[in-house]
Structure formats: structure tokens, C-alpha cells
């Protein structure tokens, strides 16, 4: 690095300023050329790194301080990177789902760790339990023993069907897994 600084100190700043617009233009192109990333490592930070250069004083602040080399890095590359390689890197090319919000090493949106959390997981389990109960009652009631086809199962030990209690009927009728007073058990 010190060798590069010495070499760049001998070059006039007017020669270093024209490559910056060229790099911005090539960084905006869609060809994906690797010209954008070397601008961070190459001459542009070195050209503005001169403490006596009046153009570097505009970008860095106080001309005598050599410490803040990071502001030129942050102020120069974002024009080519903001419209070019970074957006493409976070977009559909790197992410298989075409969404750049998760970043480059992002997981797919649904199998990720946040989807199977305790609140959503318990919600899905609570939602599936009545379905399992209904499917079990469908299997039990549609496949009765061959010797006794018309026997109603006594479900008085099960909870009362909410819909039957409110409306007086249930759309599942005798296939419902819950207790219908007077229909699939003794009346209350």
C-alpha cells in the first residue's frame, strides 16, 4: 500500500479524475464487468488521499488529516454501486426467489427459522386438530362393521357440538366428531 501511495503522489490528480466517470459509466452497464469493485481497492481512494490536494479537501474535510480514508470510500463508490452491481447482487441473480431484502446468503422465505416459530407453529397445530378429528370420524363412521350397518355411535362422552347447540343442526350430521344431544346420544 505505501508503494501505491508513492506512485500515485507522483501522478497529477487530473489524470486520476477522468477514470472515475468512466468507472461510474461502466458500473451502470448491464454487462457485469468487474470494474466496479476494483475502484474500492485501486486509484480513486488514493487520488483523494493526498492531504494537499484541494479536490480531496472537498471530499474529506480537513486537508491535514490523513486518518479518515473511509469517507472517500463511502462517498465515491455508491453512485456506481448503488445502481449497479450491489443491486444486481442482492436481486434475482443471487437469491433463488428473486427477492433482495433477505440479502445474498438468505434462506427461502417460508422454510426459514421465523416461519416455524412457536406462535405460528401452535396456530397451525390448533388449526389442524379439528381436521384430524373430522377425518378420523369420517373414517370411523363411513366404515361401520358389516354385521351392524345402522347402529349410531354413542358420543355422549364427547364435548357438545357448538354449531348443533346454537342452530339445532350440524352440516356434518352423523359424521360430526362431537356430541349432538338427542341424535348421537341421549338428550340433555
Curated annotation (Swiss-Prot):
The keyword Repeat applies. PROSITE patterns: ZF_C3H1. Residues 83-96 have a biased composition (Low complexity). Residues 35-46, 69-82 have a biased composition (Pro residues). A zinc finger (C3H1-type) spans 155-183. Keywords: Metal-binding, Repeat, Zinc, Zinc-finger. It comes from the Eukaryota. GO terms for molecular function: RNA binding; zinc ion binding. Residues 145-157 have a biased composition (Basic and acidic residues). Residues 1-157 are annotated as: Disordered. This is Proline-rich protein 3. It comes from Homo sapiens.
Amino acid at each position: 500500500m505505501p508503494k501505491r501511495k508513492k506512485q500515485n503522489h507522483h501522478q497529477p490528480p487530473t489524470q486520476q479524475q477522468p477514470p472515475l466517470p468512466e468507472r461510474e459509466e461502466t458500473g451502470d452497464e448491464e454487462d457485469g464487468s468487474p470494474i466496479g469493485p476494483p475502484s474500492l481497492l485501486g486509484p480513486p481512494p488514493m487520488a483523494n488521499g493526498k492531504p494537499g490536494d484541494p479536490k480531496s479537501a472537498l471530499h474529506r474535510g480537513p486537508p491535514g488529516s490523513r486518518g479518515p480514508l473511509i469517507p472517500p470510500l463511502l462517498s465515491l463508490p455508491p453512485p456506481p454501486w448503488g445502481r449497479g452491481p450491489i443491486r444486481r447482487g442482492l436481486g434475482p441473480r443471487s437469491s433463488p426467489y428473486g427477492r433482495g431484502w433477505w440479502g445474498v446468503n438468505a434462506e427461502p422465505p417460508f422454510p426459514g427459522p421465523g416461519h416455524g416459530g412457536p406462535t405460528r407453529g401452535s396456530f397451525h397445530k390448533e388449526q389442524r386438530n379439528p381436521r384430524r378429528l373430522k377425518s378420523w370420524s369420517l373414517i370411523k363412521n363411513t366404515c361401520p362393521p358389516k354385521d351392524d350397518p345402522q347402529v349410531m355411535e354413542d358420543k355422549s362422552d364427547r364435548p357438545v357440538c357448538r354449531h348443533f347447540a346454537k342452530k339445532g343442526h350440524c352440516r356434518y350430521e352423523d359424521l360430526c366428531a362431537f356430541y349432538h344431544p338427542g341424535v348421537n346420544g341421549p338428550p340433555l
